[in-house]
Amino acid sequence: MKILVPIDGSENSLRALRHVVSHHGGSGEAIELHLLNVQAPIASGAVKMFITQTQLNDYYRDEGLAALKEARAIMDGSGLPFHYHIGVGEIAPTIASYAKEKGCQQIAMGTHGRGGLAHAFLGSVATRVIHLTDLPVSLIK
């Protein structure tokens, strides 16, 4: 079973990952986890006057790796097979399309991420993912 766990570096996203690992680790079930960090694109055209696309890609990679650092450590200690990826784009659609592209059978995610007031109620990203995918979505509080 392939499970996608979106990781933004927040405690809620790490809690979702720990839940999946504890639930599936040692179960004997063939499982493959996909960790996905999505970086919001820097939309301002003015920014591109001062930095190159390569510098921007390096920034996305560095920020993504920083957000995935603890999740990768959890996975390294779990013994479960995993892949990680850093995407750039609108967060919820990127999560939904990545899950489809990789053939995931489930998405497990925290109810709230690093967002601010927009996430005060059931996280707006989680809500959008639910509406954008036909896959089962497990929300971990």
Indicate where each model-derived feature is located:
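General small-molecule cofactor/ligand-binding pocket signal
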Residues: 34-36, 83-87, 138
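Small/aliphatic-rich secondary-structure junction motif
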Residues: 1-51
